[in-house]
Amino acid sequence: MGNILQNLPAGEKVGLAFSGGLDTSAAIHWMRAKGAIPYSYTANLGQPDEPDYDEIPRRALLYGAEKARLIDCRKQLVAEGIAALQSGAFHISTAGVHYFNTTPIGRAVTGTMLVIAMKEDDVHIWGDGSTFKGNDIERFYRYGLLANPALRIYKPWLDQTFIDELGGRKEMSEYMISHGLTYKMSVEKAYSTDSNIWGATHEAKDLEHLDKGVKIVEPIMGVASWREDVAIKPETVTIRFEEGQPVALNHVTYDDPVQLVLEANAIGGRHGLGVSDQIENRIIEAKSRGIYEAPGLALLFIAYERLVSGIHNEDTIEQYRINGLRLGRLLYQGRWFDSQSMMLRETAQRWVARAITGEVTVELRRGNDYSILDTTSPNLTYKPERLTMEKGESTFSPQDRIGQLTMRHLDITDTRDKLLLYIKTGLLGPSSGNSTTLLPEPADSGTEKPPSR
């Protein structure tokens, strides 16, 4: 089971998930110089902050890659994101504002598709830039081995020799300059950013301090709605679903789900929709903090949840939410393709999402401020005539309700007996600090209690 390499495997092919940034640029040149045969794999995830994907493989070849490939992951990424949406697989929230697990969705796709591409090139050693303190090292480990059980793992940031020689940005920059190489030097920010078509994650550095917040973040998927100098006009948008699939925005149908997501991002981004600030538990149980953007997914989720609430009954919605919380944790932990996740996903997609057909019209204002203006669906079980307060023919009568309330008396009596028992044992009452008070039970209620059995 010793598939984690702590030293560079000289003379062997090593696949590197290559971003084109300073760290992977220095790593790929260093690996070649030390005798390994580096292969470069770059995932096109629709990152909103990447201007030229085609340039990345060219830089990898310049820095010493034996072969450099660009893998278009957008279609699969959108499909997995819609599956998460349909399942409500979002377990992290603060006061009802969700983190939409956009990075875990991206890792599920990257971790499998890049390793599959490596197998095509007979590359069975994989490296990437994840560190030992984060979630990604475990996510990539799991997904990589699912895609290739013969995979071995080499991460430069687990190799002490690499750390000693190139352990910081200053050392990596000096290394590249000393070898006459240019590289993509990102602007030094007060935090780090990772993104894909579904969302952006901002964390680390200054954002590790809870007295720093969203106001230091420059969003990459929309406007900074918290800034007073940013003008945002209200906008009405209509979202259509067919059998759980988002298919139209503002009555424009999209045959390509990728284009629909891009348009949803543009619409939501104009308002700063889907920004959240979360404290969360990493896989290793230590807490971290992130500020997230997900404008398109937030927009689709508003419409999807509205239709769920109007179409399904209370017990189905409750189970959908319970399963979604569990599935969200599994997704976060890198278990999106485990059997327990597949079971929960299939349940939601079959029995919840397939009924979700209809349109929702929303007015977007600033940030996460919105109003739902209209909801239509052929599958709505919301029927106002059943409960209308206006005079007219009713689906049930006052006598029907009297009968229903009479039946309720059975469990009310049982509940009262339990409360009296709790008072008698001291669980309730002034001494327990509980404010619940009950009238004393009448000495003779005139009703004989049935014998206990």
UniProtKB/Swiss-Prot annotation:
Catalytic activity: L-citrulline + L-aspartate + ATP = 2-(N(omega)-L-arginino)succinate + AMP + diphosphate + H(+)
EC number of this enzyme: 6.3.4.5
InterPro entries xref list: Arg_succ_synth_type2_subfam, Arginosuc_syn_C, Arginosuc_syn_N, Arginosuc_synth, Arginosuc_synth_CS, Arginosuc_synth_type_1_subfam, AS_cat/multimer_dom_body, AS_multimer_C_tail
Cellular compartments per GO CC: cytoplasm
Pathway: Amino-acid biosynthesis; L-arginine biosynthesis; L-arginine from L-ornithine and carbamoyl phosphate: step 2/3
MF term (GO), any: protein homodimerization activity
Keyword set includes Nucleotide-binding: yes
Residues the entry annotates as binding L-citrulline: Y99, N135, R139, S192, T201, E203, E280
Subcellular location as annotated: Cytoplasm
Residue numbers spanned by region Disordered: 431-453
Signal peptide (UniProt feature, chain positions): none
Keywords attached to this entry: Amino-acid biosynthesis, Arginine biosynthesis, ATP-binding, Cytoplasm, Ligase, Nucleotide-binding
Superkingdom classification of source: Bacteria
One of the protein's GO biological processes: argininosuccinate metabolic process
Pfam families found in the cross-reference section: Arginosuc_syn_C, Arginosuc_synth
UniProt record similarity statement: Belongs to the argininosuccinate synthase family. Type 2 subfamily.
Entry protein name: Argininosuccinate synthase
Source organism (scientific name): Solibacter usitatus (strain Ellin6076)
Species classification: Bacteria, Pseudomonadati, Acidobacteriota, Terriglobia, Bryobacterales
Gene: argG
